From Swiss-Prot:
The lineage of its organism: Bacteria, Pseudomonadati, Pseudomonadota, Gammaproteobacteria, Enterobacterales. Pathway: Bacterial outer membrane biogenesis; lipopolysaccharide metabolism. This is Lipopolysaccharide core heptose(II)-phosphate phosphatase. It holds the Pfam family His_Phos_1. GO terms for molecular function: phosphatase activity. It is found in: Periplasm. SUPFAM superfamilies: Phosphoglycerate mutase-like (SSF53254). It comes from Salmonella heidelberg (strain SL476).
Length: 201
């Protein structure tokens, strides 16, 4: 009887330990889930926590292109659609709930400039044509922007081929970003590290 009681107590302790471990794992998963492409998913809270440790760089693909959609154009046919502008505005509001302090940049195309403008709702925007050139030199260009921003967080509106290049080069994964998808990087000791894919919420 005593042996049975001891085994029962041990089993209860094991189950309690197992349940606690599952709760911890679930909590971690909610903060850092994994995308099907192999990149960690970083939500707003996780991004804010990362930004407390290092300057973060968030690179967004522009909103829906007018010239590749049947939806109504915002204005210029080389820019974004009305739907794209509204999506960018909603995303910007959600983003700013967690990250208020950042400098804003875009490449020199109408679609990225419009996307950044609607995302930020009045924040000052700096246009940099180097954000259109996406090869090995992209990292030096980003570091230059970080220095100009005095190591503040920065948001960059760029293009799908830039995000695809960075994901492949830094993590060896295939990333085919949709409109307004984004990658999160951070700067540490002059080096850039790819942390994952930004997922609002």
């Amino acid at each position: 009887m005593l042996a049975f009681t001891l085994r029962f107590i041990k089993n209860k302790r094991y189950l309690a330990t197992l349940a606690g471990a599952l709760v911890i794992i679930a909590g971690l998963t909610s903060q850092h889930a994994w995308s099907g492409n192999g990149l960690p998913q970083i939500n707003g809270k996780a991004l804010a926590a990362l930004a407390k440790q290092h300057p973060v760089v968030v690179l967004f693909r522009h909103a829906e292109r007018c010239d590749r959609s049947d939806n109504t154009c915002l204005s210029d046919s080389t820019g974004i659609t009305v739907n794209g502008a509204q999506d960018a505005r909603a995303l910007g509001k959600a983003f700013s709930a967690d990250i208020q302090n950042y400098n804003l940049y875009s490449s020199n195309t109408v679609r990225t400039i419009q996307s950044a403008t609607w995302f930020s709702a009045g924040r000052s925007l700096t246009v940099d044509k180097k954000m259109m050139d996406c090869g090995s030199g992209i990292y030096a260009s980003i570091n230059t922007l970080l220095k100009k921003s005095q190591n503040k967080n920065i948001v960059i509106f760029t293009h799908n081929h830039c995000l695809t290049y960075i994901a492949k080069n830094k993590r060896g994964v295939k990333f085919d970003p949709d409109y307004l998808n984004a990658l999160v990087m951070h700067a540490e000791n002059g080096k850039l590290f790819l942390d994952g894919e930004f997922v609002p919420g």
